Amino acid sequence: MAAAYVLINTAPGKAGEARKQIGEIAGVKSAHAVTGAYDIIAYIEGGDVSELGNKVVSQIQSIDGIAQTMTSVVVELP
């Protein structure tokens, strides 16, 4: 299993609806509107890193109002 945080910037006025749509995607465990450099932070899970990448590119980035994403994959440290 792989997991990642997706940091998302939206067009002005689009964060609320985008967050709602992101939250409906299978594998998205949480999606929150936040203050700071990003508008939304989502936590996603999938079978592997490739699946996470496909989810970001084909499902999250295709939502109307999504301007930019940055994905940080969760790693297990000893």
Where are these regions (language model features)?
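A compositional/biophysical signature of low hydrophobicity enriched in polar/charged and small residues
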Residues: 1-78
